Amino acid sequence: MMHNGSARKIKPAPPCSFVVFGASGDLTHRLLVPALYNLAAEGLLPEAFALIGVARTEMSNEAFREDLRKALHEFATRKVDEKVADRLLKCISYVDGAGDDEETYKKLGAELERVEKARGTEGNRLFYMATPPSAFRPIACALGRAGLAREENGAWRRLIVEKPFGTDLESARALNRDLLKVLNENQIYRIDHYLGKETVQNIMVLRFANGLFEPIWNRQHIDHVQITVAESLTVGRRGRFYDSTGALRDMVPNHLFQLLSLIAMEPPARFDARAVRSEKAEVLEAVQVLTEAEALRDSVRGQYTEGRIAEKPVEEYRKTKDVRPDSTIETYAALKLTIDNWRWAGVPFFLRTGKALESRRTEVAIKFKQAPFAMFRETPIERLAQNFLVLGVQPEEHISLQFNAKIPGPSIAIGGVDMTFRYEDYFDDAPSTGYETLIYDCMIGDAILFQRADGVEAGWRIVQPFLDAWKEKGGDGLAFYKAGSSGPAEAENLIKNNGRAWRTLVNGE
């Protein structure tokens, strides 16, 4: 969210109706409603606002409002002010029906007409698909047939699509084609909630608003980059979804590639959606697309076995409900990628993500090259602390720089130290869900933090050889790791064979 002092200077979003498909689901309760409450509390929701929930469950408006009130109290990131909550809940109504039933859209159209007159939302509509990916295409097509997404009389119509956007390159292209039959590209907002996190948004500010980093942000000074998205959570109740998806599809083309593109992109000519998204897409186009043999060489896929996390026993992945007992789906993926351009030639990017690991940690770690000469004879270069710039996303949002300094005393003894910036030390913002900025930006028509079709397809193009190679290998080559560990040993070997080492997950060293 915005700093409290600056939020007051930001205008509320324009009048609009916010339609959520899948309104009875987990995403709406845990993230969307708390995010809308936070926007309302900061005065960033318009007075002329309406929220319409759409789901299969039969429910009255009153029952839906009460359901969301309970969710708000359970999942709010700040203390709930009942006056603000009441003001928000009064704007909410509900339409029951299936996403592929034409009757649903007749009822939705009638409800939109009603709230637009009653609330004065001026015909502006924001549709949010908080549904399984299989529903994206039917909902978009039904909106098109009903004419609900057609822009007219100066009013805007926008659609937010959750990840995963496709399951491979072919399906991503097909989904883009289908959406573009109904809406223009500038109406489609492909959301990645990682881009709502302050540290992620701060990457561009760190690079381009400070004169000290960009001159050394290149192959002459950077040895390698590590991007880690580690989760201590297991698959849990998502067995059916996960066993048809896996860690690679679930995390890499979206979360990890968004981080990679922000780290590796060239400076945009302007800070606007077109320029920023063009540079992000261009750097993904420059990532070397591997052959299947190269993909096997430069990757590791793993699956967790039984173990312990936080002193609690964890059963193996294959015993999870709705998971096949002989499943070869990966719960861990590690890749080595390279970027074929002037800035990054020869600099490896190591990516890893996994479930049921020893610690929850998301970070980008940029390793700078060692000093070229051992001037301090009693401290060989190999004993000097490594110079890392670490951008921590979760569990704590921070930026730290690790470097060498003299240890106090009469001799020249050298030790590693770090300088750390934590958001909570400088800004008084209440915690957020990460969705507030994204929802607000969509309402005002700012697409900088959203993916464009070419960027999505570029990501799948990079991932496709890994998907194809792993599918062909089946169970062969699948590594195993204990739940509560740092991942498979083969992942350690992947980076070790390239002369580097992963940072630890527990304390980030």
Indicate residue ranges for each PLM-predicted region.
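Secretory/organelle targeting and membrane-embedding segments
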Residues: 1-161, 165-509
